[in-house]
Amino acid sequence: MKICRKIILLVLTISVLFVFSCKTNEKKNSAAQANGDLSKYELVAEAATKQCPVMLDEITRLDSVQYKGKENALIYNYSIINVKKSDLPANATDLAAGMMRDTMLSKLKGQAALDMFRKDKVKLVYVFKDMEGKDLFVFDFKHTEY
């Protein structure tokens, strides 16, 4: 029962936290304009990472944001600070991952703030690690999905 409660809390937390993670679209400055469109995403990632680590709720921390130019991807790195992957049953993890992905995708679709990302075909990647640094979930969304 305790594990199910943690999973439900994790799903709800993820749903709330990613609303905050997508608020990183900033205006280009003159240096970014001189370097082209791709550097604006490097600036977005740097600006977001400077504010990290940020506790989004009692168990979720945004650790960093990266931009991978070759993949044209913004990667949001999170830690779930009181969950160990080894404590979660595999079937519960798979179920939670499916629910979280669906919830995240539906919330991404409703965000006008992501129009610039869609236009520039940026892939959004959300990486969640447990308290030991092991991958719990990785969600990636192509611009055509969100």
Predicted regions and their residues:
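Short, non-transmembrane amphipathic alpha-helical segments
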Residues: 86-114
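Bacterial N-terminal signal peptides that target proteins for export
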Residues: 1-9
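A short amphipathic beta-strand at an alpha->beta junction
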Residues: 104-136
